[in-house]
């Protein structure tokens, strides 16, 4: 089977979904077709197989058919916000919020989101993950099959990630330890080499002053 790539985006981000053509939704109710998002910032010719649009709430989307992978659904939610936007006393908060997104939300009990994903057949890490960069934070779900109910549940969880994440004191304290452990793991030769190169090549830019991993004291 072939599948459609669906990209849904907030004004500050993008969500990508890949589904079989038979499961690809029609243009959402109330949505408006738009020109390609980056048509004014690139000289590359737009792919006319991609359908772009915007929902009434500002969410942007793009849909494209493809042939691989077969009968799978790939979901990507990307916010155009990362460590470069942080103030001195906020370094690492974008990355920390990314971690908290998997803890719980207004409609998903604390600690239940990962278990919910596993019940849907996803493996945490391989099929469910997230990353924070200098200018973008991205979440991913790779669904094992193109089941409409599974797609609906995945989009529900992405909606929770976009606007309903909760920050209970206990969950924050617990995740702080996880992030600190990640900091220790990254203090290796490769990371130190890259940091030294960034400080040499870009001494006054966020590439050398706003590492996504953040600072322990923050």
Question: Can you name each region flagged by the protein language model?
Answer:
Residues 36-78:
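Mature N-terminal segment immediately following signal peptide/propeptide cleavage
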Residues 69-70, 79-193, 209:
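Active-site-adjacent, His/Asp/Glu-enriched structural segments that form or flank metal-binding
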Residues 5-18:
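Bacterial N-terminal signal peptides
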Residues 1-2:
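Positively charged n-region of N-terminal signal peptides that target proteins for export
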């Amino acid at each position: 089977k072939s599948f459609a790539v669906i990209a849904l985006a907030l004004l500050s981000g993008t969500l990508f979904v890949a589904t079989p053509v038979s499961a690809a939704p029609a243009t959402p109710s109330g949505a408006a077709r738009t020109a390609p998002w980056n048509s004014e910032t690139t000289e590359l010719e737009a792919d006319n197989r991609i359908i772009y649009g915007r929902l009434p709430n500002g969410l942007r989307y793009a849909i494209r058919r493809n042939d691989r992978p077969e009968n799978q659904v790939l979901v990507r939610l990307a916010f155009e916000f990362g460590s470069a936007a942080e103030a001195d006393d906020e370094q690492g908060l974008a990355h920390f919020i990314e971690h908290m997104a998997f803890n719980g939300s207004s409609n998903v009990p604390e600690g239940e989101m990962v278990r919910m994903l596993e019940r849907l057949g996803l493996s945490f890490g391989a099929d469910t993950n997230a990353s924070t960069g200098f200018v973008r934070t991205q979440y991913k779900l790779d669904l094992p099959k193109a089941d409409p109910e599974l797609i609906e549940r995945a989009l529900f969880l992405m909606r929770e990630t976009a606007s309903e994440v909760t920050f209970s004191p206990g969950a924050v304290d617990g995740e702080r330890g996880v992030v600190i452990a990640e900091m220790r793991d990254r203090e290796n030769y490769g990371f130190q080499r890259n940091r030294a190169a960034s400080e040499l090549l870009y001494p006054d830019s966020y590439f050398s002053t706003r590492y996504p991993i953040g600072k322990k004291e923050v």
